[in-house]
């Protein structure tokens, strides 16, 4: 446990979960067991008093922050004269109430950290899935173009004649712009690829965006025969 004397009325300490366990407490004791939580904090106060001569006189103000590796606690003596005149029993009761309130707040904060951790884990898994799909396309040739707006996407879907059995495709969107990626198998003749690219450029534009960029920053809004899906959900636009 590391103790820092801030001033005459305030001390700050940081204790790792390993230190907590070495003192006979578990991480769960702090957040779920009221009696054990109070016992732990009073034992810390005894150590602080021994090392820093920080005697508990009247009510204390406590701030607790939970981190991945441990807990940081800031403890301040009250400077309010009325509160300093409280009896020892009243001060102890108020200290216990503060401990429980702060433990509850810290537990809620830990729950939020757990939710954030789970969310980041899911995001990493999703990114990993995208990379696996990208890796599976090592033997493919890719065309990526940019559509200025949804109307251009619709026009391409209705007026082009792609050979959909020869490729896989994905429609991405990022920053309000649509990107269309087409993946041709290695056995597809280059002439077919050139013809498909020529049709695309009648409605879209070349782009320097890569598949890696789109997988990391864009959102996939359609996949697997994109043109058929567009025709299904959107009517043909009129000139």
Swiss-Prot record:
Biased composition regions of type Basic and acidic residues, renumbered to the chain: 118-128
InterPro entries, per the entry: MecA_C_sf (IPR038471), Neg-reg_MecA (IPR008681)
Region of interest: Disordered: 118-137
GO MF: protein-macromolecule adaptor activity
One of the Pfam families matching this protein, by short name: MecA
Family: Belongs to the MecA family.
PANTHER family for the chain: ADAPTER PROTEIN MECA, ADAPTER PROTEIN MECA 1
Domain notes: The N-terminal domain probably binds unfolded/aggregated proteins; the C-terminal domain interacts with ClpC.
Function, as annotated: Enables the recognition and targeting of unfolded and aggregated proteins to the ClpC protease or to other proteins involved in proteolysis.
Subunit comment: Homodimer.
The protein's name in its UniProt record: Adapter protein MecA
Organism ancestry: Bacteria, Bacillati, Bacillota, Bacilli, Bacillales
Encoding gene per record: mecA
